[in-house]
């Protein structure tokens, strides 16, 4: 859990993914399109991956555990939440507020 | 269970070829009628005719005379009664005339049957779209040909048929009230109902995707012109915005800006989902082609591909979620009256696509 928090606040935008997860790929692509360059942590490549996956599920209710998106160190949500925030424009505002993008 | 299932596939699959069989059969009966025609009589009156000739009742001209018995009769009698030649010739002419009339009537009858068949085919198509094939309670689909008998899909097709009917009704209602006078509270409840109706479709699709995601993705439940625009089991929200934008009432500058931003957001989200789908296709192809191709045993490959495919359902749901959120956001941007006009325009756009599909489907079948 500590490790999730540490990694999540390391950068303005952080996404926990798995290398095999295609929806994660979509969410990453969306962030790149918005001009952000999020830190990507692939849980299936990390020795502590399973622990972090459990933490994401338990603490943030992220189900499925990935993708799990953090902006400005705060949990934004899963793919569904990210799309909602993107459509109503608030994702962009969050990214601006935490200096993940400037425009 | 398998015997029932194999039983059940042919009606739908072979449906396309059935007309060919029909025509084949008619062709044969046509041939046999032609051969009857050379005798100038339909089957059922051959015998009385022959009897009459045997009895030398030659005044009878109502039936044909060109068949073999007639010929025999004619040759036998000419030497004795030369004037009979004229009578025979007249009878032959008469018989030939009648034969031509019968042939004409027969061809006309064939033509009518052809039109009837086309009509039946169209009805069958329509019924199929409304999901009138019988579900038989088989719940396994391990052999992959089961989308026709999956009860979840059968229920979805039925529900979708009702859904379209209800949508048509709502469009009519919106059209009527927008032409008349209606207060904003009533209009808002109509608009909210129409929105809920779309959300209901997303809910239906989500449970259908659980039953058979390939069926939902294929768009088989939609008409062909609608399928042409298919993107992950439905329409691209950005396409719809593009189509609808000129049909809204006058928008304020702020509204225009909001709608443009929304369109851009939609496009970005669509691109992102499309790229995820592409990755899914790549990994699936890699999965299926893993190991040595051609060695004959591929159960592990198929199993691991099955696991990958699970992700497909989440893409259909996510795409519908994007559609859902886009509708909501439009409603936030627009006034109630503008939203009502927008929903009317959207509904009529779908109606026109459905009309286009059926016109296109019947274009070659018009009698020339």
From Swiss-Prot, chain A:
Domain Glutaredoxin: residue ranges: 1-102
Record flagged with keyword Membrane: no
Primary residence: cytoplasm
Coiled-coil parts of chain: none
GO biological process: negative regulation of transcription by RNA polymerase II
Family matches, as CDD domains: GRX_GRXh_1_2_like
Assigned keywords, A-Z: Cytoplasm, Disulfide bond, Electron transport, Redox-active center, Transport
Statement: the UniProt record of this protein carries the keyword Cytoplasm: yes
Disulfide cysteine pairs (residue numbers): 21-24
Origin: domain of life: Eukaryota
GO cellular-component term (any): cytoplasm
InterPro entries reported for this sequence: GlrX-like_pln_2, Glutaredoxin, Thioredoxin-like_sf
Subcellular location as annotated: Cytoplasm
Similarity comment: Belongs to the glutaredoxin family. CC-type subfamily.
Function text: Has a glutathione-disulfide oxidoreductase activity in the presence of NADPH and glutathione reductase. Reduces low molecular weight disulfides and proteins.
Name this protein carries in UniProt: Putative glutaredoxin-C12
Source organism of this protein record: Arabidopsis thaliana (Mouse-ear cress)
Gene this protein is translated from: GRXC12
From Swiss-Prot, chain B:
Residue ranges of the region described as Leucine-zipper: 110-124
Coiled-coil segments on the chain, per record: 83-131, 261-281
Transmembrane segments: none
Keywords, ordered alphabetically: Activator, Coiled coil, Disulfide bond, DNA-binding, Nucleus, Transcription, Transcription regulation
Tissue: Predominantly expressed in roots.
GO biological process, any: defense response to bacterium
Region annotation Disordered: where it falls in the sequence: 53-83
Basic motif: annotated segments: 84-104
GO MF entries: DNA-binding transcription factor activity; sequence-specific DNA binding; transcription cis-regulatory region binding
Boundaries of every bZIP domain copy: 82-145
Signal peptide: none
Family the entry assigns: Belongs to the bZIP family.
PANTHER family assigned: TRANSCRIPTION FACTOR TGA1, TRANSCRIPTION FACTOR TGA9
Protein name stated in the entry: Transcription factor TGA1
Organism: Arabidopsis thaliana (Mouse-ear cress)
């Amino acid at each position: 859990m500590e490790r999730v928090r540490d990694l999540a606040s390391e950068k303005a935008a952080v996404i926990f993914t798995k290398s095999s997860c295609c929806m994660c790929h979509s969410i990453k692509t969306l962030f790149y399109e918005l001009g952000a360059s999020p830190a990507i942590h692939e849980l299936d490549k990390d020795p502590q991956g399973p622990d972090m996956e459990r933490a994401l599920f338990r603490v943030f209710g992220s189900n499925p555990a990935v993708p799990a998106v953090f902006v400005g160190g705060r949990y934004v949500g899963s793919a569904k939440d990210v799309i909602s925030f993107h459509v109503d424009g608030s994702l962009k505002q969050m990214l601006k507020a935490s200096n993940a993008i400037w425009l | 269970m398998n015997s029932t299932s194999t039983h059940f596939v042919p009606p739908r699959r072979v449906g396309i070829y059935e007309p060919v069989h029909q025509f084949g059969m008619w062709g044969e009966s046509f041939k046999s009628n032609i051969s009857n025609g050379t005798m100038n009589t339909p089957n059922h009156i051959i015998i009385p005719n022959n009897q009459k000739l045997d009895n030398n009742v030659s005044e009878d001209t109502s039936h044909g005379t060109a068949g073999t018995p007639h010929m025999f009769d004619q040759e036998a009698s000419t030497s004795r009664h030369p004037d009979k030649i004229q009578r025979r010739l007249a009878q032959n002419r008469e018989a030939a005339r009648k034969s031509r009339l019968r042939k004409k009537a027969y061809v006309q009858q064939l033509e009518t049957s052809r039109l009837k068949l086309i009509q039946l085919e169209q009805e069958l198509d329509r019924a199929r779209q409304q999901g009138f094939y019988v579900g038989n309670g088989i719940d396994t689909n391990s052999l992959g040909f089961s989308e026709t008998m999956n009860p979840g899909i059968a229920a979805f097709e039925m529900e979708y048929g009702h859904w379209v009917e209800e949508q048509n009704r709502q469009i009519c209602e919106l059209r009527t009230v927008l032409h008349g006078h209606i207060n904003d509270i009533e209009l808002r409840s109509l608009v909210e109902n129409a929105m809920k109706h779309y959300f209901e479709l997303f809910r239906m699709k989500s449970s259908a995707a659980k039953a058979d995601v390939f069926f939902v993705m294929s768009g088989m439940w939609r008409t062909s012109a609608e399928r042409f625009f298919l993107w992950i089991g439905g329409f691209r929200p950005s396409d719809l915005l593009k189509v609808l934008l000129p049909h809204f009432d006058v928008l304020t500058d702020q509204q225009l800006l909001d709608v443009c931003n929304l369109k851009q957001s939609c496009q970005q989200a669509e691109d992102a989902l499309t790229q995820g789908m592409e990755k899914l296709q790549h990994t699936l192809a890699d999965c299926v082609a893993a190991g040595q191709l051609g060695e004959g045993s591929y159960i592990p490959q198929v199993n691991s591909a099955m696991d990958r495919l699970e992700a497909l359902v989440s893409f259909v749901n996510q795409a519908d979620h994007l559609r859902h959120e886009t509708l909501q956001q439009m409603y936030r941007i627009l006034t109630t009256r503008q939203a009502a006009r927008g929903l009317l325009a959207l509904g009529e756009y779908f109606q026109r696509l459905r009309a286009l599909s059926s016109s296109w489907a019947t274009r070659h079948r018009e009698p020339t």
